[in-house]
Curated annotation (Swiss-Prot):
Keywords: DNA replication. Disulfide bonds: none annotated. This is DnaA initiator-associating protein DiaA. Transmembrane segments: none annotated. InterPro entries: DiaA, GmhA/DiaA, SIS_dom, SIS_dom_sf, SIS_GmhA/DiaA_subfam. It comes from Salmonella typhimurium (strain LT2 / SGSC1412 / ATCC 700720). Signal peptide: none annotated. Belongs to the SIS family. DiaA subfamily. GO terms for molecular function: carbohydrate derivative binding.
Length: 196
């Protein structure tokens, strides 16, 4: 058991090192995409399933409340939090539409969809991205593995942050770290002296 614990830590560290080498440009582009949207008076919609839903909620909470320092609230909505809406849509046998319907209702040109999917193949996330495209929204996608179907939907203005791993747990850990990086970059860009 002790050896297995060391393996988990070692794999996580190795994934972090690989991501630190491969992802800074994509994370920086994503942060600036989010910042520009916010500066233009737009909002960020975010979605994910399972652990990715938790990461989406963490991002939205960090925008609305705060990340590490006090600052004004920023507009972000986690689409996976309203159980009544989610179950009403799913009850009509539209499971794949649980996020897309919300994107079509709430999303506007200039808004950003933060779509989080470990493999990039979750049908409801793919449909949300397709809906965001029809609303002239920009997409920031957090993925892993080969990026899945999600990667093929992104245009030149969109940003994919693909974790260099084929292990779901490692990808999800890195998604959380990436979300924290994005929150930090947004705060330090919009409120550079807030922590002084």
């Amino acid at each position: 058991m002790l050896e297995r614990i060391k393996v988990c830590f070692t794999e996580s560290i190795q994934t972090q090192i690989a991501a630190a080498e491969a992802l800074p440009d994509a994370i920086s582009r994503a942060a600036m995409t989010l910042v520009h949207s916010l500066l233009n008076g737009n909002k960020i919609l975010c979605c994910g399933n399972g652990t990715s839903a938790a990461n989406a909620q963490h991002f939205a909470a960090s925008m609305i409340n705060r990340f590490e320092t006090e600052r004004p609230s920023l507009p972000a909505i986690a689409l996976n939090t309203d159980n009544v809406v989610l179950t009403a849509i799913a009850n009509d046998r539209l499971h794949d539409e649980v996020y897309a319907k919300q994107v079509r209702a709430l999303g506007h040109a200039g808004d950003v969809l933060l779509a989080i999917s470990t493999r990039g193949n979750s049908r409801d996330i793919v449909k949300a991205v397709e809906a965001a495209v029809t609303r002239d929204m920009t997409i920031v996608a957090l993925t892993g593995y080969d990026g899945g179907e999600l990667a093929g939907l992104l245009g030149p203005q969109d940003v994919e942050i693909r974790i260099p791993s084929h292990h779901s747990a490692r990808i999800q850990e890195m998604h959380m770290l990436t979300v924290n990086c994005l929150c930090d970059l947004i705060d330090n860009t919009l409120f550079p002296h807030q922590d002084d």
